[in-house]
A protein has these predicted regions:
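Non-transmembrane "mature" sequence context
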Residues: 1-134
Length: 134
């Protein structure tokens, strides 16, 4: 019964336009970057796009696209990072403190690792493992 109700709730209401995956991911990335206090320059490095593109993304005049696979996948990882931090700590200040603190298991500050693809994947995997223990 719950699955049926969930499917019904997920359907667009009559007279409304369905929201694209690109619009949802774009909004989630911008919101995550804001809540994690990432500058547009940092967001550009994380997504592998130019600073101008990151600026347009934050202004709402650029949308992520699954056709641009690299930025799409990095955006998904950034949202996973945010969701994991939120699940583990529940508020921004604790997440900021964790990101800025040296982590022995990662051998660095997570904030320093996130701008590289390898570092972002390592941090997300670390957080996924931490969430799995909850």
């Amino acid at each position: 019964m719950r699955a049926k109700a969930a499917r019904a709730a997920a359907r667009p209401k009559p007279g409304t336009k369905p929201v694209s995956d690109a619009a949802v991911l774009t909004k989630a990335v911008v919101r995550a970057a804001q809540l994690l206090s990432f500058s547009q320059r940092e967001l550009a490095r994380i997504l592998g796009v130019s600073e101008a593109t990151a600026s347009r993304l934050c202004a709402g005049s650029y949308q992520l696209s699954a056709a641009r696979m690299k930025e799409w996948e990095l955006a998904l990882l950034l949202v996973r990072l945010f969701r994991s931090l939120d699940a583990l700590w529940g508020h921004e200040e604790a997440a900021h403190t964790w990101l800025a603190s040296h982590n022995v298991a990662l051998a660095a500050r997570p904030l320093d690792l996130v701008p590289s693809i390898e570092g972002l994947v390592r941090v997300v995997n670390y957080l996924d493992n931490a969430r799995g223990r909850l």
